[in-house]
Amino acid sequence: MANLRTQKRLAASVLKCGKRKVWMDPNEISEISNANSRQNVRKLIKDGLVIRKPNLMHSRFRIRKTHAAKRLGRHTGYGKRKGTAEARMPSAVVWMRRQRVLRRLLRKYRESGKIDKHLYHTLYLEAKGNTFKHKRALIEHIQRAKAEANRTKLIQEQQDARRARAKAARQRRAKAVEEKREQLYTAAEKIEE
């Protein structure tokens, strides 16, 4: 068998790839061994006696399948864990994610007009103070706060209406008493005359 090291080197240079990617037709070894220049190698490539092998695929099918299973909680038991809980998911990262979620929600609610800037500021500081464990807790708190504010407003309006009615009644009574007094005075003056 002829030594084709030179031809392989030249072919790799012409094809701009590594020597392991160069395929030479084993049936045409005698013709390939005569090629001793780049020009001759180009001719062999054109004729299809020398070919660049395709890139090997490194399939991600199995790893995708494993990741899908891990999302469902498989393969994550005690026996599969190497690092501490803090190393696997740092508490600082958990805290940052939670704060970003809560602050994004507060911003969205403020911009859409669901909460005013005062309630936004109060809830922002409460979120910073670790009051809300998750997004749902914050949403429920906002709903409760709004319901409480509406109830307080309704009670205040009712009290104001009650006060206004009582004041109007007092004024009517005072007016009636004044009129009665005037009538008595006029009646007394008539009697005296």
UniProtKB/Swiss-Prot annotation:
Residues 164-174 have a biased composition (Basic residues). Residues 156-179 are annotated as: Disordered. The keyword Nucleotide-binding does not apply. GO terms for molecular function: RNA binding; structural constituent of ribosome. It comes from the Eukaryota. InterPro entries: 60S_ribosomal_eL19_sf, Ribosomal_eL19, Ribosomal_eL19_dom, Ribosomal_eL19_dom1, Ribosomal_eL19_euk. Keywords: Cytoplasm, Ribonucleoprotein, Ribosomal protein. It is found in: Cytoplasm. Disulfide bonds: none annotated. One of its GO terms (cellular component) is cytosol. GO terms for biological process: cytoplasmic translation. Component of the large ribosomal subunit (LSU). Mature yeast ribosomes consist of a small (40S) and a large (60S) subunit. The 40S small subunit contains 1 molecule of ribosomal RNA (18S rRNA) and at least 33 different proteins. The large 60S subunit contains 3 rRNA molecules (25S, 5.8S and 5S rRNA) and at least 46 different proteins. eL19 lies in close proximity to the binding site for eukaryotic initiation factor eIF4G. There are 2 genes for eL19 in S.pombe. Belongs to the eukaryotic ribosomal protein eL19 family. Component of the ribosome, a large ribonucleoprotein complex responsible for the synthesis of proteins in the cell. The small ribosomal subunit (SSU) binds messenger RNAs (mRNAs) and translates the encoded message by selecting cognate aminoacyl-transfer RNA (tRNA) molecules. The large subunit (LSU) contains the ribosomal catalytic site termed the peptidyl transferase center (PTC), which catalyzes the formation of peptide bonds, thereby polymerizing the amino acids delivered by tRNAs into a polypeptide chain. This is Large ribosomal subunit protein eL19A. It comes from Schizosaccharomyces pombe (strain 972 / ATCC 24843) (Fission yeast).
